[in-house]
Design a protein with these regions (language model features):
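Extracellular/mature segments of secreted proteins
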Residues: 62-70, 94-96, 109-119, 152, ...
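Substrate-binding clefts and substrate-entry loops adjacent to catalytic sites
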Residues: 106-108, 125-127, 131, 153
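Surface-exposed patches in mature extracellular/periplasmic domains of secreted proteins
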Residues: 51-56, 133-139, 153-165
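Short, intrinsically disordered, charge-biased short linear motifs at domain edges
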Residues: 39-46, 71-72, 126-130, 159-177
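A metal-dependent hydrolase signature that marks the N-terminal structural subdomain at the beginning
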Residues: 2-109
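Long, well-structured alpha-helical subdomains associated
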Residues: 153-202
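Acidic helix-start/capping segments at beta-turn-to-alpha-helix junctions
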Residues: 54-64, 145, 160-170
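Active-site recognition of the HExxH zinc-binding catalytic motif
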Residues: 118, 122-141, 145
Length: 202
């Protein structure tokens, strides 16, 4: 599951902290096209599975951005993303990207459009790691934050834009320590570093 912890985010459909409930996956892998296929391919690349897909639909609660069902220790084959998440990612895929000038030093706080994109891209990455078998929320969160740039680039963002979004996301949408989504190992060289041989972070 992908939580929201930034109090400043005022969009109703993206507000509040996410609970621990999971929605049920539907059997089979649907045949998607266009944007839906792009989401599937991101999930497949990150999870390392060819049999997974992403569905956009209403979650059990408006505060839940995404879910993956686990059957014992095994993940299902579908990630469910909330409609606001999918709408934001679709805009990115269509080339309607918000300016990231606000992420530069001295430019002040970014607007809701940038925050929404940061949450949405990291939510897809987070749930994709769940599809890959990562059940621990703190690990999925750390891996997802490190993969936000990958998600953005796969959804047609230029590499420089994607990297900037990834850096902004890591430092601005990280959860606090008391919700189960934070790990002290989520840092350069930590045990959750996806690329320990690289000095780049995230």
């Amino acid at each position: 599951m992908r939580p929201i912890f930034i109090v400043a985010l005022s969009v109703a459909l993206l507000g509040g902290a996410v609970d621990a409930r999971h929605a049920f996956s539907r059997p089979g892998t649907p045949r998607h096209h266009g944007f839906a296929l792009a989401l599937d391919r991101v999930a497949q690349e990150i999870s390392g599975r060819r049999d997974v897909s992403v569905r956009c639909g209403t979650t059990a609660d408006p505060s839940i951005l995404g879910t993956v069902t686990f059957y014992g220790a095994s993940p299902g084959r579908e990630a469910l993303l909330a409609p606001p998440v999918c709408s934001t990612l679709r805009r990115l895929w269509e080339g309607r990207r918000p300016s990231l000038a606000c992420t530069g030093l001295g430019h002040g706080q970014c607007g809701q459009d940038v925050l929404e994109l940061a949450w949405a891209a990291s939510a897809l990455a987070h749930e994709s790691y769940h599809l890959g078998g990562v059940r621990n929320e703190a690990a999925a969160e750390c891996y997802g934050l490190q993969s936000t740039a990958l998600v953005a680039e796969r959804l047609h963002a230029p590499p420089a834009y994607a990297d900037r979004l990834g850096t902004y996301t890591f430092w601005n949408v990280r959860p606090p320590v008391d919700y189960g989504y934070f790990s002290p190992e989520c840092h350069d060289g930590g045990s959750l570093d996806l690329h320990p041989a690289s000095a780049e972070w995230p």
